[in-house]
Amino acid sequence: MEKSNETNGYLDSAQAGPAAGPGAPGTAAGRARRCAGFLRRQALVLLTVSGVLAGAGLGAALRGLSLSRTQVTYLAFPGEMLLRMLRMIILPLVVCSLVSGAASLDASCLGRLGGIAVAYFGLTTLSASALAVALAFIIKPGSGAQTLQSSDLGLEDSGPPPVPKETVDSFLDLARNLFPSNLVVAAFRTYATDYKVVTQNSSSGNVTHEKIPIGTEIEGMNILGLVLFALVLGVALKKLGSEGEDLIRFFNSLNEATMVLVSWIMWYVPVGIMFLVGSKIVEMKDIIVLVTSLGKYIFASILGHVIHGGIVLPLIYFVFTRKNPFRFLLGLLAPFATAFATCSSSATLPSMMKCIEENNGVDKRISRFILPIGATVNMDGAAIFQCVAAVFIAQLNNVELNAGQIFTILVTATASSVGAAGVPAGGVLTIAIILEAIGLPTHDLPLILAVDWIVDRTTTVVNVEGDALGAGILHHLNQKATKKGEQELAEVKVEAIPNCKSEEETSPLVTHQNPAGPVASAPELESKESVL
């Protein structure tokens, strides 16, 4: 407790008296020492933000040199190394953190927190989708852009649009990936449905083409299957009791060692971010044409991210916790800068875990349980730009969306964002699912791909912000439930009535008045019964 003459632990300058000297907090030396301490504590945040700004300046300076594609590849090499290191650490981090987190929580607490997390993810994603559809109808990003061609955007290597997939096959793939047939293969490959067109000639001379779905394996970690397996394994180890303690300690130790590796990698993040941002700016052919051609679509998407990330999510956090959400977000500047540069929720996961535990004091059991799940299934930012893109393409093709199609966009965007990969441009692949669901063509997807490198940055920031605020809400609710349980336990202890008879019989200070007699063995018998 502070004394009356103290403020934040320091003596007031008016009453400091002879204790004030060159090193006192009120002097220039004290202020310099506090400033140096602040810079030392926030060094990683300042370096990361500086890396983003330096990368933008580097890219702007090198654009006039007309670098070849080979030279741009060399320029991006330090950033590529950062992405490889972050992806290398994802597998042990996700599996170990979920196993240790699930094993450290009892079944009732795990079920309660899991239910709250699912409700939070569903609520925020659905609200993000509704906000995006409303903004798209207000701003009308597709009006006046009907004559726009992808070749006009100066992006030669945008590639072909993804093959459209049936909506039912997309959800079946989601279920298949939840239960991988081989855990080792799930670490680097994902199940995906492809199609084979079979031509059949009937006896009447009619030719029919049938599209048959076939199962394939594509490159990419099946994070959904690994998350589910790790959760179930943690619960099973908790169920084993003492027999599973050794394996739980193993996963805890491996998790702590992984976090040490993360802390080392984080010091390379500013360098990698600088070259990632710089190489991407150099790579673009004509940014001015790109922004002016699709400016309304970019504006609608980023405005949706700003409203959802700056108003909706903080408001939800405040309603549940009654705390300042922006003070909570201030401790997460480094993960936000990493998300902005890497465009990957999965690559931001190590940084987010480290900062949310050290800077914001979130319980490790909560953060290591909810953040890996959130990085996989909670995609608020992706839902926003997917809905805006769907309405944008509908307006490009002069299609008036009815109420049924709008409802389909909301539901499909909310559901498909669960299976969206937490990698750069992963959300673009799910736009084809939405377009197929409402009956729109997919030949305009290259326009979305052309500006995805811009929109995907704010998309990833909103994705990881939603995960972080969700962890903060769960931490607050868990603390509240713990305090309530301790208070109820204290009330039970106060109201308990001591057993005076038992205390009298078992106290070594009590001398019985009639120790001898025919009933001398009775106290011994009663004592034995009380032990049993």
UniProtKB/Swiss-Prot annotation:
N-acetylmethionine PTM positions read M1
Give the GO terms filed under biological process for this record: amino acid transport; cognition; glutamine transport; hydroxyproline transport; L-alanine import across plasma membrane; L-alanine transport; L-aspartate import across plasma membrane; L-cystine transport
- Cite the effect that the entry attributes to R457W: In SPATCCM; does not affect localization at the cell surface; loss of uptake of L-serine and L-alanine
Residue ranges spanning the membrane: these are 42-62, 88-108, 119-139, 217-237, 257-277, 298-318, 328-348, 373-393, 418-438
Residues bearing carbohydrate = N201, N206
A GO molecular-function descriptor = chloride channel activity
From start to end residue, where is composition biased (Low complexity)? Answer: 14-25
Give me the reactions it catalyses. Answer: L-threonine(in) + Na(+)(in) = L-threonine(out) + Na(+)(out); L-serine(in) + Na(+)(in) = L-serine(out) + Na(+)(out); L-cysteine(in) + Na(+)(in) = L-cysteine(out) + Na(+)(out); L-alanine(in) + Na(+)(in) = L-alanine(out) + Na(+)(out)
Grouped into one coarse class, the protein's main location is membrane
Bias kind Polar residues: ranges: 1-10
Which stretches of this protein does UniProt put in the Cytoplasmic compartment?
1-41
- Indicate where the modification Phosphoserine is found in the sequence: S507, S527, S530
Q: Check the record and name the InterPro entries matching this protein.
A: DAACS (IPR050746), Na-dicarboxylate_symporter (IPR001991), Na-dicarboxylate_symporter_CS (IPR018107), Na:dicarbo_symporter_sf (IPR036458)
Cell compartment(s), UniProt:
Membrane; Melanosome
| UniProt membrane topology term | Multi-pass membrane protein
Q: Name one GO cellular component term.
A: neuronal cell body
Acetylation as a keyword of this entry, yes or no, is yes
Task: List the expressing tissues.
Answer: Expressed mostly in brain, muscle, and pancreas but detected in all tissues examined.
Q: Which intervals of the chain are annotated as region Disordered? A: 1-25, 500-532
From which domain of life does this come?
A: Eukaryota
| Protein role | Sodium-dependent neutral amino-acid transporter that mediates transport of alanine, serine, cysteine, proline, hydroxyproline and threonine.
Protein family membership: Belongs to the dicarboxylate/amino acid:cation symporter (DAACS) (TC 2.A.23) family. SLC1A4 subfamily.
Q: What is this protein called?
A: Neutral amino acid transporter A
Q: Which gene encodes it?
A: SLC1A4
